[in-house]
Amino acid sequence: MEKATERQRILLRHLQPSSSSDASLSASACLSKDSAAYQYGDDVVIVAAQRTALCKAKRGSFKDTFPDELLASVLRALIEKTNVNPSEVGDIVVGTVLGPGSQRASECRMAAFYAGFPETVPIRTVNRQCSSGLQAVADVAAAIKAGFYDIGIGAGLESMTTNPRGWKGSVNPNVKKFEQAHNCLLPMGITSENVAHRFNVSREEQDQAAVDSHRKAASATASGKFKDEITPVKTKIVDPKTGDEKPITVSVDDGIRPNTTLSGLAKLKPVFKEDGTTTAGNSSQLSDGAGAVLLMRRNVAMQKGLPILGVFRTFSAVGVDPAIMGVGPAVAIPAAVKAAGLELNDVDLFEINEAFASQFVYCRNKLGLDAEKINVNGGAIAIGHPLGATGARCVATLLHEMKRRGKDCRFGVVSMCIGSGMGAAAVFERGGGVDELCDVRKV
């Protein structure tokens, strides 16, 4: 009773106007010493985040792997790394974009069974285009915060080999009467060209961003930085000429090109406009892959003695002009950071999805971000962009990098643009930065 009374007192204090501070309740949640949520173990933490390698669609190592097998591998990895009883998971939410809705929902349910989850654990899908994996993580965090359950998994899945892009069915002719609705149908490459043209992003700037992405991703791979986040997948690959099957274990992203140069990229022709600047070399790759994040209430993690990899702080989704959908992160990031009670300069690392170099460069410049803080291990241009899985992949990459950096890295942001004109961003805090009171075991 005394604890409940004290908690009410703290919450009421946040609701009362103060001459010394106008910080919101969500802002105070970022301050480990001044947070009702932290004090009572009610905030949402991440105890594991895993992904598969990302492989080139149609040509890569997962071209003969079923989507449900990709998802099962990362779901299984979360349980194996934490020894959490699968039956304790309140829900699994999977971000996925291209797979037919009812079929993909069934595939995800099948994947959970492959991974050892009992029939009592529910699963659902969510589709907010390229942010679907991040949306899944945010949905689970919100459900835990609301008290629907204490443990949940936010995941992402895409097989662009199995489910290639393309609009299916007819389009309502009335769409032509509404310019912004009509712009939702623009090819993503055209929106990239629109961003480059409207905001004067040069071809050289875009190509340089691509070179940097490959260079950093190649360095991260060579130094073993991705090993902690990548779950090896045992699968097969089929020779298209002979039909022979070969067993393989996939543990390395296969789209990274270490020898990418400005001169080499300059030779590539624009893909979407004859006089454009968007090429196959400065755009994200079509990829296959999956990722998954295990979240729980802090007091549950403490009771289980689990190390806390990160803390989920805030999430924001915003709308922008569909014709320049790539600007989404430039709007979503400030919204999420403000909700966390922070300034952009307080953020130590950013994972901004490189759908196209044009929009990546624009967002970086618009926000005035330090290039040394962004995509320090490369981005989607080098690693790949399996649409529904990208958010979960970025969360895994961010949190493992924050863990490596330790006390010098407290806050991180994941963000991406979204087809049809949106942006999403989430703020995370490094687990060790607010866990001085936790006596945790190593795994």
UniProtKB/Swiss-Prot annotation:
InterPro entries: Thiolase, Thiolase-like, Thiolase-like_sf_Thiolase, Thiolase_acyl_enz_int_AS, Thiolase_AS, Thiolase_C, Thiolase_CS, Thiolase_N. GO terms for biological process: fatty acid biosynthetic process; oxylipin biosynthetic process. The active site is at C130 (acyl-thioester intermediate), H385 (proton acceptor), C417 (proton acceptor). Transmembrane segments: none annotated. Gene3D superfamilies: 3.40.47.10. Its EC number is 2.3.1.16. It catalyses: an acyl-CoA + acetyl-CoA = a 3-oxoacyl-CoA + CoA. GO terms for cellular component: peroxisome; plant-type vacuole. PROSITE patterns: THIOLASE_1, THIOLASE_2, THIOLASE_3. The keyword Lipid biosynthesis applies. Its main location: other. SUPFAM superfamilies: Thiolase-like (SSF53901). Pathway: Lipid metabolism; fatty acid metabolism. The keyword Acyltransferase applies. Keywords: Acyltransferase, Fatty acid biosynthesis, Fatty acid metabolism, Lipid biosynthesis, Lipid metabolism, Oxylipin biosynthesis, Peroxisome, Transferase, Transit peptide. Low levels in seedlings and leaves. Coiled coil: none annotated. Residues 1-30 form a transit peptide. GO terms for molecular function: acetyl-CoA C-acyltransferase activity. Involved in fatty-acid beta-oxidation prior to gluconeogenesis during germination and subsequent seedling growth. Implicated in jasmonic acid (JA) biosynthesis. PANTHER family: 3-KETOACYL-COA THIOLASE 1, PEROXISOMAL (PTHR43853:SF13), 3-KETOACYL-COA THIOLASE, PEROXISOMAL (PTHR43853). Homodimer. Belongs to the thiolase-like superfamily. Thiolase family. This is 3-ketoacyl-CoA thiolase 1, peroxisomal. It comes from Arabidopsis thaliana. The gene is KAT1.
